[in-house]
């Protein structure tokens, strides 16, 4: 009897943890959309497509997923210098937006789950706080 109860306990624990992480991600994405609208949309556009050669796309962006830490650092501290996104070179400047670590996590979760992007590996405030210049 004990093995069955133990098995059921672990099974339902994993389901509960999975559901709460999914709910946390959904809430983060909703908050991130508002932050994106306030701080990012003027350059990267409502569609996340950016402006070719000027403002890199966030929609279906290979850079976001291949360079997660650099993407977070760019939002947190600003970005300058050449980057390559979807095979196209960009060499502009993005000023830091003055966002808190939790706001950066939220906007990253929104960006990496919008416009054809899909990321179940949630960006957290703790992860952002560990990113240094």
Where are these regions (language model features)?
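Bacterial Sec-dependent N-terminal signal peptides
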Residues: 1-31
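Alpha-helix boundary/capping residues
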Residues: 11-13, 39, 78, 111-114
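Conserved Rossmann-like nucleotide-binding pocket used by diverse enzymes
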Residues: 15, 36, 95
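Electrostatic cytochrome c docking/interface patches
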Residues: 19-35, 50, 54, 130
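A contiguous binding-surface segment within folded domains or other stable secondary-structure elements
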Residues: 26-29, 42-81
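The canonical Cys-X-X-Cys-His
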Residues: 32, 36-46, 107, 111
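Axial heme c-ligation environment in periplasmic c-type cytochrome domains
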Residues: 52-59, 80-132
């Amino acid at each position: 009897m004990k093995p069955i109860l133990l098995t059921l306990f672990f099974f339902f624990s994993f389901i509960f943890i999975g559901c709460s992480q999914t709910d946390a991600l959904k809430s983060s994405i909703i908050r991130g959309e508002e932050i994106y609208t306030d701080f990012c949309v003027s350059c990267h556009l409502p569609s996340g497509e950016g402006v070719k050669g000027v403002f890199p796309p966030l929609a279906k962006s290979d850079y976001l997923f291949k360079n997660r830490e650099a993407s977070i650092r760019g939002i947190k501290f600003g970005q300058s210098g050449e980057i390559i996104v979807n095979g196209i070179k960009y060499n502009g400047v993005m000023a830091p937006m003055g966002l808190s670590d939790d706001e950066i996590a939220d906007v990253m979760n929104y960006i990496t789950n919008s416009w054809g992007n899909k990321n179940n590996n949630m960006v957290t405030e703790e992860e952002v706080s560990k990113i240094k210049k």
